[in-house]
Amino acid sequence: SVTFAAGEAEKTITVKATESLPMNVEVPLELRLDGNASVNAYAQKMPVASLIVLKEDYEVVSHGVYTNQWTGEGCNCVLQYSPTLDTYRFVNPFGTGVNVLFTYDATTHFGTSVSKQLATGFVHPSEGNVYAKPAALNKNGNNVYFDEANKIWKIGHQWVVAAGSFGADIDTFEVTE
């Protein structure tokens, strides 16, 4: 329960996940104002905030610079690993809240994207939304490769819009720490 003092407009709440909350399962959470609360006399419905709680076990593997070949720009990025899912992810490499998830085989140094298509958040001026699809780097269809000697990850993406493809490029993630 949260109460507001007269004239107070904001409150901070903390939601803690219990040990029994399953890993990697989205759990819906709704915050509702009490039906008796005086919020807006003209409102037809009381305000509701809907959230998703997600308990994850991703750990930071490395920090680096992710260079996106679509824009040609690099950004600071984090590579994480989930032991539960046995999956890696580059966190927010396009600057749009989208993560690049992939599996990886340390013996071959190759990996494969989990997602078949990513919404990059990029918009082409005449073609619209730009999506990234995995683009194979080898004959087995893997689109992720780690060059261990140079500490550089290579990620093959095909850049697609509704009308077709702009072709494939290789994004890079250079490990800095």
What is each model feature region?
Residues 2-10:
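Short proline/glycine- and polar residue-rich coil/turn motifs
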Residues 11-36:
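Contiguous beta-strand segments of beta-sheet-rich domains
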Residues 26, 46-53:
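Short, solvent-exposed charged binding patches
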Residues 53-177:
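Ser/Thr/Gly/Pro-rich, low-complexity flexible regions
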Residues 36-49:
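Beta-sandwich strand segments
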Residues 8, 21-23, 37, 57, ...:
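Residues that cap or initiate secondary-structure elements
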Residues 9-11, 25-27, 86, 151-153:
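Residues at beta-strand starts and edge strands
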